[in-house]
Amino acid sequence: MADIHIEEFYKDAAIALVQLYSAFPRRINLFVEDIAGPDEPDEFGLHSKRHMACFGALLWLEEEGLLRYVDTIRQEALDQAVLTQKAFVRLSTPASAGLRAQLEALAPRVQDQLPESIRQDLSTHIHLIRNALRSGSSATISQVMQGAFFGGTCALTSDH
């Protein structure tokens, strides 16, 4: 994917959703620096483009009905954020067979010997997102997020 800002969006959204899922149903403060890394405002008090892009991604997740929050803490965090029912259900459900097959082709797993209940848990969108984040591959993160929230998958090539 040539658009770095889109890759960063997918990664920011993935990290935020994993943090919220891990705390669900508790409300948490979702800090931009915990997602995008440290940022020092410039001499005018303005944050970097990267910081603001991450903050924008968090606001977009709310606008699209994937999270709720009580207020913003300046442009640094969302106060009392929690997943919506829509996001919780989506993250908890198994991914499509097509998406799982594409990911398994990249990194074959030995899941056939596992009990069905464990295989189902390992096939959920949240598990695939966590694995994609652990891989560090922007292409894999993008593919998993597209499959989980945008209903499509793209052919995965190599990461840059």
Regions found by a protein language model. Give the residues of each.
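Short amphipathic alpha-helical interface segments
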Residues: 2-46, 52
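Short acidic, glycine/proline-enriched loop segments that cap or flank alpha-helices
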Residues: 4, 46-49, 71-79, 98
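Generic structural signal for hydrophobic core residues of well-folded globular domains
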Residues: 20-24, 61, 90-94
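A short, conserved structural fragment
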Residues: 59-75
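Short, amphipathic alpha-helical interaction segments positioned at domain boundaries
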Residues: 79-113
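Membrane-inserting effector segments that mediate pore formation, membrane fusion
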Residues: 107-160
